[in-house]
Amino acid sequence: MALPKIEDARKLSDEELAEEIAATKRKLFDLRFQQATRRLEKPHEFKHTKHRLGQLMTVEREREIAQTEIAVNSEQ
């Protein structure tokens, strides 16, 4: 499985992005639980899930910064 591209995350709406972040955090929690109980079959999924979470949170932060810049520019 190839790592997902950040362009895919940028295409999501704000609501979809928030849902995807929550789902990815839940998946990471489940993977940690599986690892603790020694049921983890694919340890590389940690890398993929953390990578995806980083991408999603980066896109979320980019949008926050863009909104802040718009607000600051509209005040001037």
Swiss-Prot record:
Pfam families (alphabetical): Ribosomal_L29
MF annotations from Gene Ontology: structural constituent of ribosome
GO cellular component: cytosolic large ribosomal subunit
Keywords: Ribonucleoprotein, Ribosomal protein
Entries under SUPFAM superfamilies matching the protein: Ribosomal protein L29 (L29p)
Keyword Cell membrane: no
The keyword Transmembrane helix belongs to this UniProt entry's keyword annotation: no
Taxonomic superkingdom: Bacteria
GO biological processes: translation
PANTHER family associated with the record: 60S RIBOSOMAL PROTEIN L35/50S RIBOSOMAL PROTEIN L29, LARGE RIBOSOMAL SUBUNIT PROTEIN UL29C
Family to which this protein belongs: Belongs to the universal ribosomal protein uL29 family.
Record's protein name: Large ribosomal subunit protein uL29
